[in-house]
């Protein structure tokens, strides 16, 4: 077995408002049980994560944008990798539910639902044509899920997108998994997948094994987003990108909060409307978050009723309490900021109330993989409790 050390450390930071913020940081992503030299660490670009609090496992998406990515879905056992205590730093392992690492072709985002299923969207192709591209299966995009409650995480869902609905799968953004009744058999589940190029939502009805696309003017970008690097200003334009789900009503429906990647406005729509194939959407404008505060990822916390935003160019994580309407800048606040938190790419609240957020320094700009930083570009941070994260801020109803 070949094991080697990664440029990976777990550090303890002090948040801007005093909350203890634990975090991982990488200069390069390196793999366990993979022969050094068989892959190029510079090609390993992680875009998103999911954390299973019950199993204490961290799952990372590493899309096959560039050649020789060993595993597009990687895993870290955080229970046995106590980096805070400063001993051994874990490498990335193959996902426990896989035998070869080629079971998935390329993913951008993992999501864990309320039934402890890990969901991914396999875009079905690699994004290069050089040597080795044919080593991975090519197929229509697929929604795949694994049961984290079972040993070895068996695959329990695989649904291929209908050909008529496949359009630019490399432009899928974030997605949300909506379980109507987590205390039931979990069969009544919907998946809402954003497409930030087309400005559309792909909706999958798991129980009926059906799917469809919906569009709406609120899914479009408002104007280009600006990103600063190396003294130069770059621009990108992204439609609907982030989506998160609020509290359920008695019928299992809830608000779906969403935003475009190039926008400051936030909207909500009732999932009852999303679940009706061919139905009409009636979104509500909740307000705007303030100039230059564009974000591609957001996460709702049911305990505090707060939505957290990982921002694109401000190097910060912000918050807004949904009980403070309307959404406007004076009702928002900052829970974390760092000059090294470059391009917030993912954020989530785990099942035990921990707030996680990630930056990777890779905005959706052509050749951003060539951007160089003199510090670890990948940062995955955690504040142990969401109430602690917002204490004393405008998002704290008790302040």
Curated annotation (Swiss-Prot):
Residues of this chain annotated as glycosylated in UniProt: 213
Main location: secreted
Gene3D superfamilies, sorted: TolB, C-terminal domain
Binding locations of serotonin: 345, 360, 362
Highest taxon in the source lineage: Eukaryota
Keyword entries, A-Z: Allergen, Disulfide bond, Glycoprotein, Secreted, Signal
UniProt note on tissues of expression: Salivary gland (at protein level).
Signal peptide: 1-18
Any one Gene Ontology cellular component term annotated for this protein: extracellular region
One Pfam entry name: MRJP
TM regions (residue ranges): none
Function: Probably modulates blood feeding of sand flies on vertebrate species by binding and sequestering different mediators involved in the host response. Binds biogenic amines. Binds serotonin with high affinity. Binds adrenaline and noradrenaline. Binds dopamine and octopamine. Poorly binds histamine. Induces a delayed type hypersensitivity response in host tissues. Induces systemic Th1 immune response in the host. Immunogenic; elicits antibody production in the host.
Protein name stated in the entry: Yellow-related salivary protein LJM11
Organism listed in the record: Lutzomyia longipalpis (Sand fly)
């Amino acid at each position: 077995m070949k094991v080697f050390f990664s440029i990976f450390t777990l550090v303890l930071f002090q948040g801007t408002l005093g909350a203890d913020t634990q975090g991982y940081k990488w200069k390069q992503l390196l793999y366990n049980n993979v022969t050094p030299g068989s892959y190029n660490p510079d090609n390993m670009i992680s875009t998103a994560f999911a954390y299973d609090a019950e199993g204490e496992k961290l799952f990372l998406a590493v899309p096959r944008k560039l050649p020789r990515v060993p595993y597009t879905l990687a895993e870290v056992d955080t229970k046995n990798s106590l980096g805070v205590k400063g001993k051994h730093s874990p490498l990335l392992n193959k996902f426990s539910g896989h035998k070869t690492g080629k079971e998935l072709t390329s993913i951008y985002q993992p999501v864990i639902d309320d039934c402890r299923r890990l969901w991914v969207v396999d875009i079905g192709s690699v994004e290069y044509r050089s040597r080795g591209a044919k080593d991975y299966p090519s197929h229509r995009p697929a929604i795949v899920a694994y049961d984290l409650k079972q040993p070895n995480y068996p695959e329990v869902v695989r649904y291929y997108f209908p050909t008529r609905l496949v359009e630019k799968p490399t432009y899928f953004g974030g997605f949300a998994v909506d379980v109507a009744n987590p205390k039931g058999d979990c069969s009544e589940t919907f998946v809402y997948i954003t497409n930030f190029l087309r400005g559309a939502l792909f909706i999958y009805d798991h129980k009926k094994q059906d799917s469809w696309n919906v569009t709406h003017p609120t899914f479009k970008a408002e104007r280009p987003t600006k990103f600063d690097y190396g003294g130069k200003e770059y621009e990108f334009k992204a439609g609907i990108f982030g989506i998160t789900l609020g509290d359920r009503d008695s019928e299992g429906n809830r608000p779906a909060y969403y935003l475009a990647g190039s926008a400051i406005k936030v909207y909500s729509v009732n999932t009852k409307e999303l679940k009706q194939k061919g139905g009409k959407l009636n979104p509500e404008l909740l307000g705007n978050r303030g100039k230059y505060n564009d974000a591609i990822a957001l996460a709702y916390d049911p305990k505090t009723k707060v939505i957290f935003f990982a921002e694109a160019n401000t190097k910060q994580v912000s918050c807004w309490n949904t009980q403070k309407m309307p959404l406007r800048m004076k009702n928002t606040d900052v829970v974390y900021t760092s000059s090294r938190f470059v391009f917030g790419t993912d954020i989530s609240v785990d099942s035990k109330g921990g707030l996680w957020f990630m930056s990777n320094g890779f905005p959706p700009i052509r050749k951003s993989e060539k951007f160089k930083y003199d510090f670890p570009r990948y940062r995955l941070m955690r504040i142990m409790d969401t109430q602690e994260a917002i204490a004393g801020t405008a998002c704290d109803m008790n302040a």
